[in-house]
Each structure stands twice: as C-alpha cells, then as structure tokens.
Amino acid sequence: CFCNEELFGAGQTGFKLAMKEDYDVVIQFDGDGQHSAKYIDAMVKEIENGNDIVIGSRFVSEKKPFTARMIGSRLIAGAIKIVTGKKVMDPTSGFRAYGKACIKDYALDMNNPPEPDTLVYMYRKNRKIKEIQVQMSEREFGESYLNLVNTIKYMSRMMVSIFLIQPFRKV
C-alpha cells in the first residue's frame, strides 16, 4: 500500500529497499532546501572509514546559538549525554548517512525511526556515530510542522524515549 505513512513510514520504506538492494550507504536528506548535496561525499567517506552513522552537523566547529529554536536541540543533546555519556552537538539534524548495519537496524525495527532519541539505542548497540561540520541554509520549501503545540508534544516524546524507553530496549 502506497498510502501516506508520514516521515517514519517513508523512511523505513527507503531503508527496506536499501537493505533488499544491498546498498552500502543511505543518505537522509530533508526536502526543504536546508541541506546541500556538496557534503554527501564527505559523509560517505566517513561511513567507508568505519562509522555507522554520520550526522551533518551545524555545530562541530560553530557555536550553537541561544535561540528559542535551539533550546530543544540543547535539551535533547543534554539528555543523550546524561544517558549515554556521549556528546552529540546536533542531534536534531535531519542530514545523516547510514552504513549497512544501521540500514538493517532501521529497516527491520518498527520502533526505531531515525530520530534523535534512537541515537541512544544506536550507542547501546555500539554503533559508531560521527558528526561532520556542514552549513545549512534557511528552509526554502514547505513549512515546519513544529508549532508550539507540536513542539511540546515532540519534546515530550523525545524526553520520555531518551530517559525511559531507549536505555531499556533489548539490544
């Protein structure tokens, strides 16, 4: 059925196809014009160097601004650090590369959308996660679904998952 399965359903369909076709790398790339394809080669190279997930990060060498928009990113990064001891500078980045092990992880597990909270689970599975510095543009297309109500719901879901679900999932 090719019905609207929203972000995760569409993403998982891509991971399933990539697993079936034996792809080495999957690139997660937002369609709103923020991400530049010029970083894909560097991300793939990091997968080839043994990393399982490469995050295109705005904040490897740049400071994260203190804006209302970045408060959520800071909270999620802090929660991941508390639970895993690992520092993720840009956990909400939708610009990522995944190697074969993670392609399989995301293709087969309905409880594992490629969202910030599942980085906790990936660390527990001993997946290597690396961030590389990228520049992102302002949104060119579409509108964010994150209004005040949806932001509160999203942040609540992320915090519950990071603190109460991901640390206890069977690895």
Predicted feature descriptions by range:
Residues 2-20, 25, 37-112, 139-149, ...:
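Acceptor/aglycone-binding surface of glycosyltransferases and processive sugar-polymer synthases
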Residues 117:
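Cell-envelope/extracellular polymer assembly enzymes that use nucleotide-activated donors
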Residues 31, 59, 135:
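Residue-level "edge-of-site" marker
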Residues 86-87, 109-110, 120-137:
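Catalytic donor-sugar/metal-binding loop of nucleotide-sugar-dependent glycosyltransferases
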Residues 34:
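A short, conserved beta-strand element in the Rossmann-like catalytic core
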